[in-house]
């Protein structure tokens, strides 16, 4: 779809990055799935860059939705890590994930974290999710995602 849009533009229009970004988006690297992938692989530098972009664009990427997605990701990781001996169909029933390639990605990532680390991360996510929903009296909610990445990195 994006390639079709770009192909309809004149050659002089394509010469600026701004127009390509306008039709294609800032970057395919800046989405929740890439953030999850980078966190799963413990690539905190790239996760921090994505989080910084999300924080700077919090209307487009509300922290409440980001933290909910991260919670689901790490909860699925916990369930899969806890049940590595189960078959594909058993894990699918447990997690509600029926795409084998996604489950395989989770299995690969599961070696990067211990169960204790995952439980700790889930607790940290809940804390920052609460802050993003205004449950604490901190008004600096745009930086919560960056604080979260810094905290799980240590």
Predicted regions and their residues:
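Amphipathic alpha-helical interaction/assembly segments
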Residues: 2, 9, 54-83, 117-154
């Amino acid at each position: 779809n994006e390639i079709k849009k770009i192909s309809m533009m004149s050659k002089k229009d394509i010469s600026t990055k701004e127009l390509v970004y306008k039709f294609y988006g800032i970057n395919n690297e800046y989405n929740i799935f890439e953030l999850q992938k980078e966190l799963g692989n413990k690539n905190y530098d790239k996760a921090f860059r994505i989080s910084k972009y999300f924080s700077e664009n919090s209307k487009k990427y509300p922290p409440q939705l980001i933290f909910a997605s991260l919670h689901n990701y790490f909860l699925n990781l916990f369930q899969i890590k806890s049940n590595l001996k189960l078959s594909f169909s058993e894990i699918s029933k447990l997690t509600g994930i029926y795409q084998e390639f996604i489950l395989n990605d989770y299995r690969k990532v599961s070696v990067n974290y211990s169960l204790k680390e995952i439980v700790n991360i889930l607790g940290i996510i809940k804390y920052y999710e609460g802050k993003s929903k205004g449950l604490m009296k901190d008004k600096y909610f745009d930086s919560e995602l960056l604080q979260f990445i810094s905290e799980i990195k240590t």
